[in-house]
């Protein structure tokens, strides 16, 4: 018996990659995606599964932001690599009462 080689144009298991998406809460969701499929597909599926909006979170791989048009092949991702998910930080104002006001701090000059 001779060993058959995959023919040109025939899809093999190497066309797919298994990726882990790790949330800040420690949860991990696994996805199987084609190496040349835009990661937007994975990102949208993750958001739907977790009940999140794409505007609420950011995806990073090796510390770098991931764009929706990026593919695993472009980012040189390997099987079982992990994508990190971070909640989008909005605002930055101090909470009410944390900044002294003249009524609360009569000894301070403004």
From Swiss-Prot:
SUPFAM superfamilies listed in its UniProt record: Ubiquitin-like
Cross-link Glycyl lysine isopeptide (Lys-Gly) (interchain with G-Cter in SUMO) per UniProt, renumbered positions: 11
Boundaries of every Ubiquitin-like domain copy: 15-92
GO molecular function terms attached to this record: SUMO transferase activity
InterPro entries assigned to the protein according to its UniProt record, in alphabetical order: Rad60/SUMO-like_dom (IPR022617), Ubiquitin-like_dom (IPR000626), Ubiquitin-like_domsf (IPR029071)
Propeptide stretch(es), residue numbers: 93-110
Keywords: Cytoplasm, Isopeptide bond, Nucleus, Ubl conjugation, Ubl conjugation pathway
Bias (Polar residues) ranges: 88-101
Main location: cytoplasm
Covalent cross-link Glycyl lysine isopeptide (Gly-Lys) (interchain with K-? in acceptor proteins) as placed by the record, residue numbers: 92
Post-translational modification: Polymeric chains can be formed through Lys-11 cross-linking. Cleavage of precursor form by SENP1, SENP2 or SENP5 is necessary for function.
GO cellular component: glutamatergic synapse; nuclear body; nucleoplasm; PML body; postsynaptic cytosol; presynaptic cytosol
UniProt subunit comment: Interacts with SAE2 and UBE2I. Covalently attached to a number of proteins. Interacts with USP25 (via ts SIM domain); the interaction sumoylates USP25 and inhibits its ubiquitin hydrolyzing activity. Interacts with BMAL1.
Function: Ubiquitin-like protein which can be covalently attached to target lysines either as a monomer or as a lysine-linked polymer. Does not seem to be involved in protein degradation and may function as an antagonist of ubiquitin in the degradation process. Plays a role in a number of cellular processes such as nuclear transport, DNA replication and repair, mitosis and signal transduction. Covalent attachment to its substrates requires prior activation by the E1 complex SAE1-SAE2 and linkage to the E2 enzyme UBE2I, and can be promoted by an E3 ligase such as PIAS1-4, RANBP2 or CBX4.
Family per record: Belongs to the ubiquitin family. SUMO subfamily.
UniProt name for this protein: Small ubiquitin-related modifier 3
Species name: Mus musculus
């Amino acid at each position: 018996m001779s060993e058959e080689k995959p023919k040109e144009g025939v899809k093999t298991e190497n066309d797919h990659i298994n990726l882990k998406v790790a949330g800040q809460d420690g949860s991990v969701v696994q996805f199987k995606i084609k190496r040349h499929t835009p990661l937007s597909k994975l990102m949208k599926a993750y958001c739907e599964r977790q009940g999140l909006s794409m505007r609420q979170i950011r995806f990073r791989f090796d510390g770098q932001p991931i764009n929706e048009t990026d593919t695993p092949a472009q980012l040189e991702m390997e099987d079982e690599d992990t994508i990190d998910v971070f909640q989008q930080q909005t605002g930055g104002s101090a909470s009410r009462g944390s900044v002294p006001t003249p009524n609360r701090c009569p000894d301070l000059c403004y």
